[in-house]
Amino acid sequence: MKITVIHGQGHKGITYKITKTVLEFLAEDDDEINEFFLPKDGPSFCVGCNTCFMKGEEFCPGADKVQPIIKSMEESEIIILDSPNYVMEMSGNMKNLMDHFAYRWITHRPHANMFKKVGLTISSSAGAPPSNTVKSMAKQLKWMGVPKVYKFTLISNALNISTISSKKEAELKQKAEKIASKVKRRANNPHASLKGKIMFYIFRKMQSSPDAAWNPKDRDWWIEQGWIENVRPWK
């Protein structure tokens, strides 16, 4: 099994610790884990040039950074996004990377194998609930077609890993073991979700109409995949 992990921060703090603990329960010795640390491994800020939409993702100014991450996600059964809770949201570095993935949304040029993957979003905070952060990251994966995204949150009551209490450490480990079991179970039985199928059919209808499909690049993609006809990405 292959796992892609995208860290929304460069430092190895509490959120990083959570992810590593989950991986200890989730990954087997022969599994392949590819990790990307932002901003180091990510692109510079998206400038909204629309090149990825209109011309192709390979022409994006940040393609040399974006496409290796995309390739890893494509080859993985499980995709993990983690980010500390920054002002009730994902880090700016993570959001910037998600901006570069916009062309892969179901509205544009989704890829078939994303409909069979499993996602996990992870966030921690010192006090305020980080639920919005994990939901926001999960939304990004779902719009790329990922049918099931699990969410892991932890209110650490600490500023860094050295000040986290033993009680919180135990809570972290217990929650990590539980969610790793769920993720592994789903990864062994991948299938598209009803919501994902509904979204697909909504935008299939749009791409089927030359008048409604405003971007020829997107429409050509749907035609090439056979989705305008009888082919479906989850089969």
Indicate residue ranges for each PLM-predicted region:
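A generic structural motif
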Residues: E28-N34, V146-P147
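A structural signal for isolated positions on well-ordered beta-strands in alpha/beta enzyme cores
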Residues: K2-T4, N34, L120, Y150
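N-terminal beta1-alpha1 ligand-phosphate binding loop
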Residues: K2-D31
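N-terminal beta-loop-helix "entrance" segment that forms/cooperates
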Residues: L38-E58, N160-S165
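Glycine-rich phosphate/pyrophosphate-binding loop and the adjoining helix
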Residues: P147-K235
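Residue-level recognition of beta-strand->loop/alpha-helix junctions
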Residues: H7, F37, F152-T153
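Helix-loop-strand module that forms the ligand-binding subsite of alpha/beta enzymes
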Residues: P61-P147, D218, W222-P233
